């Protein structure tokens, strides 16, 4: 049976999300703590909670602390106009970066943020003085966890991996699944259950170009 949804690759590790990707859509709706640096007229009804029996002013006052979806915070952020400033989520602050540098494998990334790497990469958009430390922490965390993830995916044939997978960020889960698929394909090949072997796309494209050159 064909899949109802053709998976589109995430673009969150680049400068912009890919809004044809369900992973990026979900990631862009995660909340980001911000502080307004100027009053925001006529938006109080949208962003401020009403207290019992009180009416909400039409403006969001300067200095208000809000939690906005990532996509909205990115749209409102402007270095020149200083509409809002961003507060780093705890998982990306120095305390947690120290934990990651000590042993990144002890952290349940999915519990802390299911799109840890993608969301962290998008934080670099806000020109924080900690951007260099954040990017380095993201890279070193990924490197520190990658080997264990792939080793587990290659040595867990027909085993229960739910406890391990439950602790992985969404991107890590994708890598784990790729490793599992490769292992399953290899096991099928060893047992003679593989389908007909075909040339890779790279080889086929090379042959097509070579044939075209010969015709010319």
Swiss-Prot record:
Gene Ontology CC terms: CMG complex; GINS complex
Keyword Transcription regulation tagged: no
Top-level taxon of the source organism: Eukaryota
UniProt keyword annotations, A-Z: Chromosome, DNA replication, Nucleus
Record's subcellular location: Nucleus; Chromosome
Stored InterPro entries: GINS_A, GINS_bundle-like_dom_sf, GINS_Psf3, GINS_Psf3_sf, PSF3_N
One protein family per Pfam: Sld5
GO process annotations (BP): mitotic DNA replication initiation
Protein family according to the UniProt entry: Belongs to the GINS3/PSF3 family.
Assembly: Component of the GINS complex which is a heterotetramer of GINS1, GINS2, GINS3 and GINS4. Forms a stable subcomplex with GINS2. GINS complex interacts with DNA primase in vitro. Component of the CMG helicase complex, a hexameric ring of related MCM2-7 subunits stabilized by CDC45 and the tetrameric GINS complex.
Protein name per UniProt: DNA replication complex GINS protein PSF3
Source species of the chain: Pongo abelii
Phylogenetic placement of the source organism: Eukaryota, Metazoa, Chordata, Craniata, Vertebrata
């Amino acid at each position: 049976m064909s899949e109802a949804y053709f998976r589109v690759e995430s673009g969150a590790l680049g400068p912009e999300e890919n809004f044809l990707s369900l992973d990026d859509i979900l990631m862009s709706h995660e909340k980001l703590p911000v502080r307004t640096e100027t009053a925001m007229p006529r938006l109080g009804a949208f962003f401020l909670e009403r207290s019992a029996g009180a009416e909400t002013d039409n403006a969001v006052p300067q200095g208000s602390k809000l939690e906005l979806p990532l996509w909205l915070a990115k749209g409102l952020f402007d270095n020149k106009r200083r509409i809002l400033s961003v507060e780093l989520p705890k998982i990306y602050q120095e305390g947690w970066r120290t934990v990651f540098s000590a042993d990144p494998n002890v952290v349940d990334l999915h519990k802390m943020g299911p799109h840890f790497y993608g969301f962290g990469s998008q934080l670099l958009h806000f020109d924080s003085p900690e951007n260099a430390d954040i990017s380095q922490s993201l890279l070193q965390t990924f490197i520190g966890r990658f080997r264990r993830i792939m080793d587990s995916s290659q040595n867990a044939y027909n085993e229960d991996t739910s406890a391990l997978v439950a602790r992985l960020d969404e991107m890590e889960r994708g890598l784990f699944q790729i490793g599992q698929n490769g292992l399953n394909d290899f096991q099928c090949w060893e047992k003679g259950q593989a389908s007909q072997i075909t040339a890779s796309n790279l080889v086929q494209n090379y042959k097509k170009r070579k044939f075209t050159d010969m015709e010319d």
